[in-house]
Amino acid sequence: MRVVIAMDSFKGSLSSIEAGKAVAEGVRRADGAIECAVCPVADGGEGTSAALTEGLHGETVRVRVTGPLGEKVTAEYGVKGDLAILEMAQAAGLPLVPQDKRNPMKTTTYGVGEMLRDAINRGCKRFVLGIGGSATNDGGAGMLQALGFDLLDKDGNPVSFGAEGLRVLAKIENKNALPALKNCVIRAACDVTNPLCGENGCSAVFGPQKGAAPEMIREMDGYMRNYAALTKNLYPESNLDTPGAGAAGGLGFALGVFLHAELMPGIEIVMEETRLEEKIKNADFVVTGEGRLDAQTAMGKAPVGVAKLAKKYHKPVIAFAGGIEKGAEACNKAGITAFFPAVRGVTTLDEAMRPETAAENLAESAEQVFRLLTLR
């Protein structure tokens, strides 16, 4: 019997690979002859870079870059051959900004551009970039500046960091952009479809969680429209209504237009890079899961992405989760054959989330399920 194990991380407890290895341990306890293939899974959010880097046996690189408030921070990204695996949140994520200093007028994506530049200097030509969890609403302007694009005011001076820089933006030039960008293929893990501007745009929808008040939201939306109009002078094909343009405070717009990146669901990128489909083709069972299974899981999170791929080849899918919430039955309709809670008995959340406890709970649950599946 062949089993493919593609677990998402149990946030705050186990990484994707750690969760997968725990399940594999349980499966082998049930029957040591079962072949287990553990693959990393992530949906493009926090932990995607670490999961994919570990799963591909890549190298973790640490680099000092400009943080969201202009301070220096240490960012990590993965490298495997000519592939770089990055998360914008490492350089411009909301957790890097204290609650009382959250102000998207000031926060910048400059460090994201520095990460990309560092990876390019290391010889990378293919990029996977997770763009969730941003603290910014600068339309990716900071990233572009770090990559050599000139964003200038009416006097020809570089605009300042943050959305407030877009307020005085009068001209965009690409003649000094990093030449190596022409040879780069970038895929951005993007799970939102918001346009750049308007009531569903980045300022209106995501601005409040980044510290924007109603008046600031209106101002930033106006700045974004000006930015989009100036961009159209340079790139006539650009469109502020492109699905995903509003991702990460407009970073999706800059990536798609200036860097010709492809915006696609994170789970699809991860599954493609790990060649999960090839492994599933030859499997008898597929195992997936995450920390909590609920109605949101069925809306396209990693376990359902795995299940849809397995369904293509008519493979049964078993899911394990730390917690099963109301609405989880929607996962059955989305392709998960059966799901099981991994927590055994009444316990506290802190105890259940201890890595050694979570791993053993997963192993024990997997063992019991596969004892039944291997019954002769």
What feature does the model see in each segment?
Residues 1-131, 135-376:
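N-terminal loops that bind phosphate or other acidic moieties
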